Amino acid sequence: MAYKVDNAIIMAAGTASRFAPLSFEKPKALIEVRGEVLIERQIKQLFAAGINEIVIIVGYKKEQFDYLIDKYGVKLVENKDYLTRNNNASIYYAKQYLKNTYVCSSDNYFVKNPFEKYVDESYYSAVYAEGHTEEWCIGQDAEGYINAVTIGGNDSWYMVGHTFWSKEFSSKF
């Protein structure tokens, strides 16, 4: 069964400490790559796929995102706990918007548009890392479903990019 995507939530609350010193003046989502602001490129790609309801979770330097409301008609939601909590807090603040939803990282640059209006099932994007990594690693059962998440691991798949959550999956939050 294919799910019609209802909306997208873009996570943009973090301080981007790994982007320092670039992130001292602006959030990483607002950094330009190849002449385009990262988050604006992602918004345009979502629009091109027919996804017009976009919620952006902000925190660090949140006022710098205000222009996106008028320019693109997005909704901003504040993660008041961005300094002490991770993306789980951002999802908590956005829980009322979870439906058939893309959950995206604001700092991804996609050359080719990865978004589609219809998606077959909930998924996470992952990359395999040989050796040790400090990323969020996933474990899988025999059918390929995620059954564990750990911070750090060896010879592991780790989460990257965007995810899709069906309404059924989202309701568990």
Which residues fall in each region the model found?
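The conserved acidic donor/metal-binding loop of glycosyltransferases
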Residues: 106-109
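Conserved core of the sugar-phosphate nucleotidyltransferase
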Residues: 111-173
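A generic secondary-structure signal marking the coil-to-beta-strand transition
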Residues: 6-7, 29, 100, 136, ...
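Terminal amphipathic alpha-helical/low-complexity segments used for targeting or macromolecular assembly
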Residues: 1-6, 15, 44, 123, ...
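Canonical Radical SAM [4Fe-4S] cluster-binding loop centered on the CxxxCxxC motif
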Residues: 21
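Conserved N-terminal catalytic core of the sugar/cofactor nucleotidyltransferase
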Residues: 1-10, 18, 32, 36-103
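Short alpha-helical oligomerization interface
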Residues: 24-28
